[in-house]
Amino acid sequence: MNRREALRYGGEAAAVTALGTLLIRAGVVGGDADEAVFPPSVDADERLLERCIKCGRCVQVCPTSALTFADVPDGLLHSGVPILDPENGGCIAWNEACLDCVDACPTDALRDLPTDDRGRLPADEVIGVAQVDAGRCINCSNCDPVCPTDAIREPGYEDRETFSVDTDRCPGCGRCVEACPVDGTAIELYPPDEEAAYPVRRG
């Protein structure tokens, strides 16, 4: 892509983003991607739509390939914005100093975040919530060691027969989803306020 094409693409993306924001504010269309989990630092759906120019830099720099582009099924106005795809990779920002997506964003659609003394995100920075499908879980324990906040509970916790997730501790990083060996995964990741995530689904 040459400079002229890049400028044209950027202009078109900005125009679509601006139109989307106006439609949301006018109440013509909804702005929520019902099942999408956004990258760390996306604290307002409208902010993302206002500022994201869909340049793809955050997706390109993600070291675990956790980010991908939202498609039309995720919501027409969200098409092209970054979302988390934990089956490709989980977000490691709670494990180590990595906010590459934030650093790469040229428009501050992804805002800077406070970190601990090792550069990691704190446990109370939540982007989603994981839930184990008890009917599909094979109790392999792969999810347990990769969880950065000790949110995985072993079988027997609250009389459950499979591994489960303590939703009060889960940051929604998706590392457990990535680690799950079950075809199609036995763990789902939801937005933090998604009602489908509560209570734990039982087999």
What are these regions (language model features)?
Residues 1-203:
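Non-ligating segments of multi-cofactor redox enzymes
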